[in-house]
Amino acid sequence: MANLEDLIARVSDRRLQAEMASALGILKRRQRFGLVFEEHLPETTVLVGLPIQVGSLVQRRDDLGARTLYRVIDLTADQQACIVPLDSDAAESLPLASLLVVKRFGDPIFPTLTSLGALRRGDTSRPSHAVINGENYHALQLLTFLFAGQVDCIYIDPPYNTGARDWKYNNRYVDDNDTWRHSKWLSFMAKRLQLARRLLRPDGVLIVTIDEHELHHLGMLLEKVFPAHARYMVSIVINPKGRREPNFSRIDEQAFFVVPSTGAEIVQGTTSLQAILPLIDSETDDEEDERPEEDEVPAAEQADDAIDWEYRHARRRGAESSYRHQRPNQFYPIFIDEAPRRVVRVGASIAVNDEPHLGHIDGLRPIWPIDAEGRHRCWRYTPDSMQARIELGNVVLGKYNRTQDSWTVNIRYPRNKSRKLKTVWWDTAHDAGTHGTQLLSKMLGAPGLFPFPKSIYAVRDSLAAVVRNRPRALIVDFFAGSGTTFHATCLLNADDGGQRRSILITNNEVAEAEARLLYEQGHYRGDPAFEAAGIFDRVTRPRCEAVVTGLRADGAPIAGKHIGGRPLHTGFTENVEFFRLDYLEADSVDLGLEFAALLPLLWLGAGAVGEHRLPSDTGGFLVPDDSTFGVLFRESRFRPFRAALDQRPDVTHVWLVTDSEQAFAEMCAALPADKRVAMLYRDYLRHFRARARQTA
């Protein structure tokens, strides 16, 4: 090393000398044992649409493999750029329209999201999922600005690096002939996993699926990036028929669950019943008498499934908290149809002093929470919560008491038979052929548009292991592919009424053979014909739209059903918005010229509730009626802004536009302590400048 330092000191080019000294410093700090791999040249990414300036790094649009990079040294009035290759001094002039900006990882970037459209089938209070078309490393940098320490589960299915040219490094496919392919893959993954770690909550879990090609390398990398976490490897049988290979027929792939070593049971066990049932919150008090009463014994026709279900009276009992005056909102009728022995619906709660109406209404008999002694008790759940359980079939009639002419209303719960999940999953629902490839073909109306999609149920069960008891979980997938994670999240929400939301990230990569054909036809990156052939435009977005609407892109209803009987054509009552990752100039942001471009970020970071509309006249501040954030544009309007926030306890995030640190501190002190407050545009610019320094 000392000899190298002497040689570097003799280099006359001071800039080159500094770069060589920096590289040597990295070598000296590098570990010599454990997982050792080359960092390689900095990764690069093409930024379609970013304006070209003097000093920009660019490539030619017709250079499919990005073999040559150039530096822009001059711009002319006739829309020409004078460029110089990085490896020579031979300048040439090309039209600006023939060039694309390239960024190296470590160069400062200032990303934003541009909406490409939305689907809203859920109500306005339901948060939106987000599906982002963009380079996942930059998108992860953006998410660390918005969601550091807030993500419940990250599920990723990265490229498996099989040697079959199934992924790119520096815009070039990596194949079996590349002797550095494993090292490149590790370098590629390490950068992204380090950002992913910043996103996770203290009890957040990372799930990574992989096969034998990088299994052991990945395990060591996860140990390095997540040293304070336990790593569990689960084998999932995805191809019961097996692949034709020498010696063994492989039927499985692996999933690493990277779980915080907190001592708590973070991964939730399951049974076959619980996999399709809603979460049940007991809503019981410690002092409630939990001994079953005679009328809680299931009716004869319910005894057959008593091994799987426990039946509990729908009426609270035992403690003082079970009486009507303690919970007046939980005193209401449950209407039943006696002939078919069916619980139909709930009625409205009545005032404490009102007497319950006992007569039939529309042929339905009302059952009130009144015990055998005539005491007014209350039901276990509020009307909305009880109605949700009725619709799921979990509120049933029990025994009929002929003497008192009364019915028992029971709620059924899955018996507590939950066991720890095993490390081998063999379930026909996880077959990637039937529930991945074939399902995707149904939804897109054409086969072969995406290779090897996951079974939706393998993804659902993986997510459920982490978020089953987190109905408002935030889920991220930054190798989104065909959008299976979004579909699985919708299915979990439909099963239990949850409001989990997912953020999916994928690029718009075009398959190699098709990209070459398009280039031969004169269609390049950024051209509509080229982009239409990409994974986001052709697969991810159409699949997510089909999931929500139940319709293919051609308007035809999707045939078939989910396991459990839910028709595909019914879709889901979810909201989802599609975005493109774009890039801003720091000076424009600093001057306050880019608020409209940043508005979707603020909306997404505040929970993605409602819509992100910018009115023509804000009056100095913005507190959207249907969203959960507020923005102050002018300090002089702070008092009415503060008054508006007082009327909106649902607002969670506040952004203050000011150049004064002191004014920001004073306004923060005057705001409620439960608000997340940030300073525009300082915090945004600082974050991405800091990320660039950490990457360099």
Residue positions per predicted region:
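Accessory, often C-terminal, charged low-complexity segments
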Residues: 1-123, 127-128, 144-148, 152, ...
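Short glycine/proline-rich turn/loop motifs
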Residues: 117-126, 169-177, 433-447
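Conserved helicase NTPase motor core
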Residues: 124-156, 160-162, 166
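Conserved proline-anchored active-site loop of SAM-dependent methyltransferases
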Residues: 149-168, 222, 475-489, 598
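Active-site-adjacent "gating/activation" loops or surface patches in catalytic cores
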Residues: 152, 158-167, 415-455
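Short, flexible, mixed-charge acidic loops at enzyme active sites
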Residues: 166-172, 516-521
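Glycine-rich S-adenosyl-L-methionine
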Residues: 176-195
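Glycine-centered, small-residue-biased loops immediately flanking beta-strands
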Residues: 204
